[in-house]
Amino acid sequence: MDFANLAAQLNAGTILPEGIVIVTLMGVLIVDLILGRTSSRWIGYLAIAGLLAAIVALYFQWDATNPISFTGGFIGDDLSIIFRGIIALSAVVTILMSIRYVEQSGTALAEFIAILLTATLGGMFVSGASELVMIFISLETLSISSYLLTGYTKRDPRSNEAALKYLLIGASSTAVFLYGVSLLYGLSGGQTELSAIANGIITANVGQSLGAVIALVFVIAGIGFKISAAPFHQWTPDVYEGAPTPVIAFLSVGSKAAGFALAIRLLTTVFPFVAEEWKFVFTALAVLSMILGNVVALAQTSMKRMLAYSSIAQAGFVMIGLIAGTDAGYASMIFYLLVYLFMNLCGFTCIILFSLRTGTDQIAEYSGLYQKDPLLTLGLSISLLSLGGIPPLAGFFGKIYLFWAGWQAGLYWLVLLGLVTSVVSIYYYIRVVKMMVVKEPQEMSDVVKNYPEIRWNLPGFRPLQVGLVLTLIATSVAGILSNPLFTLANNSVANTAILQTTKVVSTQVSAIPAEKSEGL
């Protein structure tokens, strides 16, 4: 094989955005090695510039004529582009909120950013991976980096405990997922590319076998861990409470987006012959997530634990689009994850600012905050109200789109359950808003009474302010001006071949038993 044919099969230009992230990662390490601690003033901006360049590269790859690279191991279609963009953008905002936080914790900023970029790289590769080895390596890159980030503040016992729990539960879920993947490899006759696995299973007529069912259950268990879906959510509250706040901000968006990207690609490509079965399993997960997440969040006293259970509930809402299995369903998932990126990171930015100034994340300590810090109060209020689905904020339109897609697909009772649990979530979101805004001066918490003077010119606070303002504007405006995001989500689904061919494959598979019965 000559070099030209090899280059054509590799088509490495498809992973140009990931290449830019790799170069940025190496640049961060080299600059830190040469300049040491003096580089911390601007090394975060170097990483942000690299990530923004990767997002620009993704933009120019939209509707690529040949999105397949590495002989089918990676597909840079529009679906992967939108998810890779979400992950990269979440990393940008995370770096903005991390600079002051990491410096104040006494740890090295360059190493933190390097690990974060590695996690971003893993998530971006997961979003387009179409081959078992590529999926597993990408997933492990994301997972191991996440474990390291969770325990990054080594002097904090809570961070160490969270990292250990995350590692143990994550390793178990990885083993379960890997066993399910190995069953797929065997059932398909030794295939590793996703479409070849589906064809091999259909040809061998083992789609309804016990092995295929076990593989499906194990794969869903691995995905459920990544998206924090109940009952695979046990790690979420403890990790959210103990890990550095910028880390959980990234995990709540970047890791979740990677998990849903993997779910769409893996389930629709490999399991079209048991679509009803995996939709039934995800229906159970969605019901558990929406009920457990919203009900348990009512009793939380820590803001981070409350958002942990909120994250579990949000995963349940997004699963409605996956269960619908229609173009509108997949597009609604993408749209909701886009707006979830802004409203969730806006909330975490406010929590970081409050914890940096007060040293606590207890909900009761936010009492009367409006009188001392109006901008932070506004940002957190808009974020929480949007998460609750209050119009005309972005979260309202995201939920309407999800529920409408589910209703059109006939998921009437699941949509009604989503509406009821959304009302429950509004209670604990508004409780925090009311505490910050409505309290009288004499009801102000002791922490807020001693609230330090607001000084944005301190080192690392300006990026936090920029992150807060940008996410606040996006959360407020994305709802009113949602049409461009709707169009983007719809186009990403309509232009993705696997989501269109899946309908044909599932129709053909469902017709096989009928043809056999007619022959008999």
Curated annotation (Swiss-Prot):
Keywords noted in UniProt: Membrane, NAD, NADP, Plastoquinone, Quinone, Thylakoid, Translocase, Transmembrane, Transmembrane helix, Transport
Listed transmembrane segments: 15-35, 42-62, 79-99, 106-126, 132-152, 167-187, 210-230, 244-264, 280-300, 306-326, 334-354, 378-398, 400-420, 466-486
Organism: Trichormus variabilis (strain ATCC 29413 / PCC 7937) (Anabaena variabilis)
Biological role stated in the UniProt entry: NDH-1 shuttles electrons from an unknown electron donor, via FMN and iron-sulfur (Fe-S) centers, to quinones in the respiratory and/or the photosynthetic chain. The immediate electron acceptor for the enzyme in this species is believed to be plastoquinone. Couples the redox reaction to proton translocation, and thus conserves the redox energy in a proton gradient. Cyanobacterial NDH-1 also plays a role in inorganic carbon-concentration.
Organism domain of life: Bacteria
EC number: 7.1.1.-
Record-stated family: Belongs to the complex I subunit 2 family.
Presence of keyword Transmembrane helix: yes
Catalytic function, reaction form: a plastoquinone + NADH + (n+1) H(+)(in) = a plastoquinol + NAD(+) + n H(+)(out); a plastoquinone + NADPH + (n+1) H(+)(in) = a plastoquinol + NADP(+) + n H(+)(out)
Designated name of the protein: NAD(P)H-quinone oxidoreductase subunit 2
Membrane topology of this protein: Multi-pass membrane protein
Subcellular locations according to the entry: Cellular thylakoid membrane
Broad class of where this protein is predominantly found: membrane
Nucleus in keyword set: no
Example GO molecular function: NADH dehydrogenase (ubiquinone) activity
PANTHER family per the UniProt record, alphabetical: NADH DEHYDROGENASE
BP GO annotations: ATP synthesis coupled electron transport; photosynthesis, light reaction
Assembly behavior: NDH-1 can be composed of about 15 different subunits; different subcomplexes with different compositions have been identified which probably have different functions.
One Pfam short name: Proton_antipo_M
One GO cellular component term: plasma membrane-derived thylakoid membrane
